[in-house]
């Protein structure tokens, strides 16, 4: 397997439309594009699939634990397929970017994101790639939890969907090793 792509979010219908599920939205859109059917894989506790795209074998992982327990499923699938951390791309919501923005980044801190914090712990490293999908910030730290656990207004959802589209548009360059070109294209929007 060439890459493991993981989308972070919270499982269940009550969370499906919340901002915190931007990673799920991104991975599901990708799965639909490459014709992959995500199915429950009990041994990893995630919805999983394999697919071929851009001449590469991809693993798709959507953890079915809550956000703060995302690391275990991603680590388990990565270990099974012997995928090194630097070949993992984690798609997640990002408070520090406005709706409509997206960024590719390797490594770094978790910035208070509990899904990334758990991934750092489970993988034993921060040296994995992140696709950060902007959801905006509510303005005050005390408002963060209700903000990420609520649905964005339609205008913001449209911007988030556009960022997901642009992100998936640069994914072939990224996966084939043209990371600078992918970042330049995505970050210039």
Curated annotation (Swiss-Prot):
Its main location: cytoplasm. GO terms for biological process: protein quality control for misfolded or incompletely synthesized proteins; rescue of stalled ribosome. The record marks 93 as: Stabilizes the basic form of H active site to accept a proton. GO terms for cellular component: cytoplasm. The record marks 10 as: Discriminates between blocked and unblocked aminoacyl-tRNA. Keywords: Cytoplasm, Hydrolase, RNA-binding, tRNA-binding. SUPFAM superfamilies: Peptidyl-tRNA hydrolase-like (SSF53178). It catalyses: an N-acyl-L-alpha-aminoacyl-tRNA + H2O = an N-acyl-L-amino acid + a tRNA + H(+). Pfam families: Pept_tRNA_hydro (PF01195). TRNA binds at residues 15, 66, 68, 114. Its EC number is 3.1.1.29. It comes from the Bacteria. It is an enzyme of class 3 (hydrolase). The active site is at residue 20. It is found in: Cytoplasm. CDD domains: PTH. Signal peptide: none annotated. GO terms for molecular function: peptidyl-tRNA hydrolase activity; tRNA binding. Belongs to the PTH family. Monomer. Hydrolyzes ribosome-free peptidyl-tRNAs (with 1 or more amino acids incorporated), which drop off the ribosome during protein synthesis, or as a result of ribosome stalling. Catalyzes the release of premature peptidyl moieties from peptidyl-tRNA molecules trapped in stalled 50S ribosomal subunits, and thus maintains levels of free tRNAs and 50S ribosomes. This is Peptidyl-tRNA hydrolase. It comes from Acidithiobacillus ferrooxidans (strain ATCC 23270 / DSM 14882 / CIP 104768 / NCIMB 8455). The lineage of its organism: Bacteria, Pseudomonadati, Pseudomonadota, Acidithiobacillia, Acidithiobacillales. The gene is pth.
């Amino acid at each position: 397997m060439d890459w493991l792509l993981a989308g972070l979010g919270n499982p269940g219908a009550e969370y499906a439309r919340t901002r915190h599920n931007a990673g799920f939205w991104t991975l599901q859109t990708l799965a639909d594009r490459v014709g992959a059917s995500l199915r429950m894989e009990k041994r990893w506790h995630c919805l999983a699939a394999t697919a071929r795209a851009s001449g590469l074998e991809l693993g798709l992982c959507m953890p079915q634990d809550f956000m703060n327990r995302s690391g275990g499923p991603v680590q388990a699938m990565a270990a099974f397929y012997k995928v090194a951390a630097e070949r993992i791309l984690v798609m997640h919501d990002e408070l520090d970017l406005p709706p409509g923005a997206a960024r590719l980044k390797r490594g770094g801190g978790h910035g208070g994101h509990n899904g990334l914090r758990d991934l750092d712990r489970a993988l034993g490293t921060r040296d994995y790639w992140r696709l950060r999908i902007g959801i905006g910030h509510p303005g005050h730290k005390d408002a963060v939890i209700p903000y990420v656990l609520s649905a964005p207004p339609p205008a913001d959802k449209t911007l988030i969907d556009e960022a997901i589209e642009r992100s998936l548009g640069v994914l072939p360059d990224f996966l084939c090793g043209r990371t600078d070109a992918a970042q330049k294209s995505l970050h210039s929007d």
